[in-house]
Regions:
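N-terminal lobe of the biotin/lipoate ligase/transferase fold
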Residues: 1-91, 109, 118, 254-256
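Long, positively charged amphipathic alpha-helical accessory segments at protein N-termini or as interdomain linkers
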Residues: 5, 69-71, 76-95, 105-256
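Gly/Ser-rich oxyanion-binding loop with an adjacent helix/lid
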Residues: 98
Length: 256
């Protein structure tokens, strides 16, 4: 597919329960590569059905991709596009990609992604990739969130402008994913700054693993090297990093 052949479609809603829910319910009548975004979500959600707080002024949207069936590919498309869009609109902010589906500033979460299959007759027919980006939170509001969070742009980035930038970059990565998913993964892995960082991985039930992110496997698994040098793969979990580790890793990336 040529990049000029793919049309970008936007649908702007004032209020919706969840943009992912909307796209999954209406995918049949929506065109491929439609970006649905809303001013307010009343039931926004993230990974593991966690609540995504959705105040007006921030970005909440879902991209429908009918030519991809693997949710992991969708995560790569949208995370790379979101990273490029934020670097374009706020080049002074050190945003970085964190496995499995987040964008961070230092050790604080600035954006999250939820990629879901749209299944019909027991077969994945398309994917709906939701993205929430903190654009307008005040520092006092961020302090009330139970995990470290950050906002990009201090309310200066309009959600509609961000939607346009996001779609522009997503178009390029979507076509790349259709043509050669291996190339998309290679680029995503290269730009995933978690690799090389010291981290703690929470597996649930009060179980934690500490080590260094040695890489990410093509199927999306995090390769973690523990203190004894043994590498294991993990497909889910919550990653925690400290500011010193983040800054050290990002500085090494700049030099390489």
């Amino acid at each position: 597919m040529d990049i000029d052949e793919l049309q970008i479609n936007f649908l702007h809603l004032e209020t919706v329960d969840s943009t992912n829910n909307f796209v999954k319910q209406h995918h049949a009548e929506l065109d491929d590569f439609t970006l649905v975004y809303a001013d307010i979500q009343t039931a926004g959600r993230g990974r593991l059905d966690r609540t995504w707080i959705s105040r007006q002024g921030n970005f909440f949207g879902t991209l429908l991709m009918k030519k991809l069936a693997n949710p992991f590919l969708g995560t790569m498309v949208v995370s790379l596009a979101a990273l490029d869009a934020l670097k374009s609109l706020a080049p002074e902010v050190p945003v970085w990609l964190k496995w499995p589906n987040d964008l961070y500033i230092d050790e604080c979460k600035a954006a999250g992604i939820l990629s879901e299959s749209i299944v019909q007759a027991d077969k994945s027919r398309a994917i709906a990739v939701g993205l929430g980006v903190n654009l307008a939170w005040e520092s006092s509001e961020l302090a009330q969130i139970d995990k470290p969070a950050a906002s990009v742009g201090n309310g200066k980035i309009n959600p509609g402008k961000f939607a346009s930038e996001l779609a522009k970059y997503a178009k390029m990565y979507y076509i790349m994913g259709i043509a050669c998913s291996e190339k998309l993964f290679e680029l995503w892995h290269k730009r995933n700054d978690l690799v090389g960082m010291d981290l703690i991985l929470e597996l649930g039930n009060q179980e934690f693993v500490q080590g260094v992110a040695a890489g990410i496997a093509p199927d999306g698994a995090l390769i973690l090297r523990d203190v004894s040098g043994v590498e294991k793969r993990y497909y889910c979990g919550d990653v925690s990093v400290n500011r010193e580790s983040v800054r050290k890793a990002l500085e090494l990336r700049k030099r390489s």
